[in-house]
Amino acid sequence: MSAKFNFEIAVIGIDIGKNSFHIVGLDRRGAIVLRQRWSRGQVETRLANLPPCLIGMEACVGAHHLSRKLTSLGHDARLMPAKYVRPYSRGQKNDFRDAEAIAEAVQRPTMKFVATKSAEQLDLPRPPSSVSFA
């Protein structure tokens, strides 16, 4: 099933959850034109059907993989530290408001972004276990 959108999305904010992603899309004027919850499997397929746009996410381990994938689809995916997104939140905290704050923050010219890491960079060596299985 392919998702077709009848409006032009310029910026997307994604709040990454364990099982679902909250998506808020803004048009060029900054008006909200998309507010949906997608499952993990729907994110890549639905975003593949959109023309390239600016996509913001809070930096976490899962965001690096998604950022690499979205960049390969032609989108401009950017990661931000959560502490820099927080000032853009309005009202009571919920996942859609977090996604909206991410969409607002990613557009700011003074925003500090986190570089997307490769899978090798994220694969940190583990300390040796003190438990012996002999």
Identify the meaning behind each predicted range.
Residues M1-F133:
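Phosphate- and other anionic-substrate recognition elements at nucleic-acid/protein interfaces
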